[in-house]
A protein has these predicted regions:
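An alpha-helical, amphipathic repeat domain used for nucleic-acid recognition
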Residues: 1-162
Length: 162
């Protein structure tokens, strides 16, 4: 692998960061794959931040918006993905306003309706269990899922005890 100077690494990263929003960890991982030294990686990242190529808040807003609208992810899954990308929690906690609550609930409702059509069972309990697991895997909150499935707390407690 070629040894990159700071300037070469910076030029490559400015080009790469210009194509889409990137975060510190993505840039760092890419430079590490190229065997760039940690000292150079840190300098390049600082220069990218100073130049406006990397902005964690801007990245976070775009990430939340894209995963929510395009992938139909729930808030829990988005938060976990941002944690994996090492975005500080105080940054993504302030960015949830990108998600309109009514639209969020509408997307969950449509996902559950669509999934319901693909599940072949006559048992309501089994159907609800499968829908709950599906929506939880997509990162939606249990209370929101239950609300869309019209499961009352009393009925739910009785079903799970059987």
């Amino acid at each position: 692998m070629k040894d990159f100077t700071e300037e070469e690494a910076f030029e490559k990263m400015t080009a790469w960061c210009s194509t889409a929003e990137r975060c510190r960890s993505e840039v760092s991982e890419k430079l590490q794959r190229w065997s760039v030294s940690y000292a150079i990686i840190n300098k390049v990242i600082e220069r990218l931040i100073d130049g406006g190529y990397i902005d964690e808040e801007r990245y976070c807003r775009a990430f939340i918006r894209d995963k929510y609208r395009l992938e139909k992810w729930g808030k829990q899954k988005i938060a976990k993905a941002l944690y994996v990308k090492r975005i500080p929690q105080h940054i993504f906690d302030t960015q949830w306003d990108v998600i309109d609550n009514d639209e969020y609930q509408s997307i969950l409702h449509k996902l559950l309706q669509s999934k319901r059509k693909s599940i072949h069972t006559n048992d309501d309990k089994s159907l609800n269990e499968k829908l709950i697991r599906f929506a939880l895997s997509r990162g939606y909150d249990y209370k929101d899922i239950r609300q869309h499935l019209d499961i009352s707390e009393e009925l739910e407690e009785n079903e799970w005890e059987m």
